[in-house]
């Protein structure tokens, strides 16, 4: 084997070792993001919902700050119910849906866990599209406002 080949092989191995420390992203969040874009017809980027209020984004506590934040709390609760009643892993559950004229629609062939998680996401995406967005509630200090 040529020395150049060994260097390339070593570089690939080192790259893979470094990548193993990066946590995988939940597959479902990609679908949920697309559902949000379907529901709001691309009027607001999905990232604007990732750190909003007390419940939009990772975790959640306290009282929702507004209607949009309530949508996120309902979504969190819906995922919690799917975990309990369907023994689901909502963040990892892949489902089939389409973007219709009324917004996201879950495929009728989906049942059980996939159906539950899809409905949680579709309902939340439609709720996001209807709720007003208050820039002052993005990236708030959750330690003081979400008790």
UniProtKB/Swiss-Prot annotation:
GO terms of biological process kind: arachidonate secretion; lipid catabolic process; phospholipid metabolic process
Arranged from A to Z, the UniProt key words for this protein are: Calcium, Disulfide bond, Hemostasis impairing toxin, Hydrolase, Lipid degradation, Lipid metabolism, Metal-binding, Platelet aggregation inhibiting toxin, Secreted, Signal, Toxin
Q: Which GO terms describe its molecular function?
A: calcium ion binding; calcium-dependent phospholipase A2 activity; phospholipid binding; toxin activity
From the UniProt record, list the residues forming the propeptide. 20-27
Positions bound to Ca(2+)? 55, 57, 59, 76
Question: Mind telling me which InterPro entries this protein's record contains?
Answer: PLipase_A2, PLipase_A2_Asp_AS, PLipase_A2_dom, PLipase_A2_dom_sf, PLipase_A2_His_AS
Recorded catalytic reaction(s): these are:
a 1,2-diacyl-sn-glycero-3-phosphocholine + H2O = a 1-acyl-sn-glycero-3-phosphocholine + a fatty acid + H(+)
- Residue numbers annotated as active site: 75, 121
Tissue specificity statement from the Swiss-Prot or TrEMBL entry = Expressed by the venom gland.
Q: Which cysteines are joined by disulfide bonds?
A: 38-99, 54-146, 56-72, 71-127, 78-120, 88-113, 106-118
Main localization of the protein described in the UniProt heading: secreted
Provide the top EC class: hydrolase
User: What top-level branch of life does the organism fall under?
Assistant: Eukaryota
The record's cofactor note says: Binds 1 Ca(2+) ion.
Q: Which GO terms describe its cellular component?
A: extracellular region
Extract the signal peptide range: 1-19
**Which cofactor does this sequence's record say it needs?**
Ca(2+)
Protein EC? 3.1.1.4
Q: Where in the cell is it found?
A: Secreted
Pfam families this protein is in?
Phospholip_A2_1
Quote the function comment for this protein. Answer: Snake venom phospholipase A2 (PLA2) that inhibits collagen-induced platelet aggregation. PLA2 catalyzes the calcium-dependent hydrolysis of the 2-acyl groups in 3-sn-phosphoglycerides.
> What family is this?
Belongs to the phospholipase A2 family. Group I subfamily. D49 sub-subfamily.
User: What's the protein called, per UniProt?
Assistant: Acidic phospholipase A2 S9-53F
Q: Which organism is it from?
A: Austrelaps superbus (Lowland copperhead snake)
Starting at the broadest rank, the lineage of the source organism is:
Eukaryota, Metazoa, Chordata, Craniata, Vertebrata
